[in-house]
């Protein structure tokens, strides 16, 4: 089972395309939708939905995957639910760059202070990070500097922020998923 979390643009047709591409790895791909505008509510909702899916799951090696803001959530929810994560161009600093787009961007900073201390150290090697060199929305170099101590970083030379085509990375994602 692969759980997919969309980014800020929840209505993007690219979400459906990514789900179809992920089905080459595992036919059981589930998209969880969330508001993107209310961080504390989103966190509760995502934890509840992922937990529900894991309770009914028969896959011994589930994976959670997210793009942009969905990558922010996939890393945290995956850690809290003890499943591996794959994140594409994660938005690690939504409290800095989401002002005017969501109701309370400061809630992201608050969530960070309430998260498990040093969670990335405890999550070491359980997350695969795929970054675009052509990310027009986020500073991928800053993201790499923040995460490379803990996770493998894969650079993509073609894609933009929304990462429309993930197919060149499917084999690596499949191998990462099988590590469980």
Swiss-Prot record:
It comes from the Bacteria. SUPFAM superfamilies: alpha/beta-Hydrolases. NCBIfam families: PRK04940.1 (NF003431). Belongs to the UPF0227 family. HAMAP family: UPF0227. This is UPF0227 protein YcfP.
């Amino acid at each position: 089972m692969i759980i997919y979390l969309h980014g800020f643009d929840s209505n993007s047709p690219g979400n459906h395309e990514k789900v179809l591409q992920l089905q080459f790895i595992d036919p059981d791909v589930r998209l969880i939708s969330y508001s993107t505008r209310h961080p504390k509510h989103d966190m509760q909702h995502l934890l509840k939905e992922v937990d529900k899916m894991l309770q009914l799951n028969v896959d011994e090696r589930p994976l959670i995957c997210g793009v942009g803001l969905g990558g922010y959530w996939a890393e945290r929810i995956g850690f809290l639910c003890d499943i591996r994560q794959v994140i594409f161009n994660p938005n690690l600093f939504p409290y800095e760059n989401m002002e005017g787009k969501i109701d309370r961007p400061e809630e992201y900073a608050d969530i960070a202070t309430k998260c498990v201390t040093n969670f990335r150290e405890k999550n070491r090697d359980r997350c695969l990070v795929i970054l675009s060199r052509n990310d027009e929305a986020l500073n991928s170099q800053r993201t790499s500097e923040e995460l490379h101590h803990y996770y493998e970083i894969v650079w993509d030379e073609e894609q933009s922020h929304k990462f429309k085509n993930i197919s060149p990375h499917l084999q690596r994602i499949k191998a990462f998923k099988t590590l469980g």
